[in-house]
Swiss-Prot record:
The gene is adc. Gene3D superfamilies: Acetoacetate decarboxylase-like. Catalyzes the conversion of acetoacetate to acetone and carbon dioxide. It is an enzyme of class 4 (lyase). GO terms for molecular function: acetoacetate decarboxylase activity. Keywords: Decarboxylase, Lyase, Schiff base. InterPro entries: Acetoacetate_decarboxylase, Acetoacetate_decarboxylase_bac, ADC_dom_sf. It catalyses: acetoacetate + H(+) = acetone + CO2. Its EC number is 4.1.1.4. HAMAP family: ADC. This is Acetoacetate decarboxylase. Coiled coil: none annotated.
Length: 252
């Protein structure tokens, strides 16, 4: 393979059989259980990178079922998203996500900078309850429950919430272990067709784990719960802040 061929095929690894395809990345019947809770503000500030800003000390704990996604297949994801603002615009910062499918782990980390790890999340209806669980190895570290479709939510309002910007801290090391990429990335969910939105009574339990520290942001109070069903496209990202271009990087 000559240099021109390497460059023309340089999208993802392995170069002869990439772990994930080029987009667009469309999701059909993507189902969310989002439980918003109040947490310790000091612990929240310790994990949210500048220049993002936090307001109320809230966390969205999410269980997401994705049965039909372009190139990524059928999988489930779970993790924590923190409400933040950037230059006065409200959005969400993804702290960590845990999922059961390699292509979106590889693609998520390499393309956008999603902080993804391999685990075993489940989202399913059990009789009258929507139940989300997350196991890391043999250890249950998250359990979320919500009464199934107790009350409808306003679709236009919930769609507007899904359309707000999302932020990621993309970190990729150089071959010598020093940072090669250290960027704040912004992306949007696009072409959203919100098919349903509901709420109900909810509960969330988090357990401590050395390698999946979801409980480091403790649940102090449940604020709201949402069950959403949508078709949407995961848009590609843009770099809004490069940490390696800052004066602090030159002082390392």
């Amino acid at each position: 393979m000559d240099v021109k061929s390497v460059l023309s095929n340089a999208f993802a690894m392995p170069i002869t059989s990439p772990a994930f395809p080029m987009g667009p990345y469309r999701f059909i019947n993507r189902e969310f259980l989002i439980i918003t809770y109040r947490t310790d503000p000091d612990k929240l500030r310790a994990v949210v990178p500048e220049p993002l800003e936090i307001g109320e000390p809230l966390v969205h704990y999410e269980f997401i079922r994705m049965p039909d996604s372009t190139g990524f297949g059928d999988y489930t994801e779970s993790g924590q998203v923190i409400p933040v603002s950037y230059k006065g615009v409200a959005g969400g910062y993804t702290l960590a996500m845990y999922l059961d499918d390699h292509p979106p782990i590889a693609g998520g980390r390499e393309l956008w900078g999603f902080p993804k790890k391999l685990a075993n999340p489940v989202l399913a209806v059990h009789t009258d309850t929507l139940v989300g669980t997350l196991d890391y190895g043999p250890v249950r570290i998250a359990t979320g429950t919500m009464g199934y479709k107790h009350r409808q939510l306003d679709l236009a309002q919930q769609k507007k919430r899904l359309e707000t910007p999302n932020f990621l801290l993309k970190v990729i090391p150089h071959v010598d272990g020093t940072p090669r990429i250290c960027e704040l990335v912004r992306y949007y969910l696009q072409d959203i067709d919100l098919k349903g939105a509901w709420t109900g009574p909810a509960a969330l339990e988090l357990a401590h784990h050395a390698l999946a520290p979801v409980a480091e942001l403790p649940v102090l109070e449940i604020v709201e719960a949402r069950h959403l069903l949508a078709d949407l496209t995961l848009g590609l990202g843009e770099v809004v802040f490069d940490y390696l271009d800052q004066p602090e990087a030159n002082a390392r």
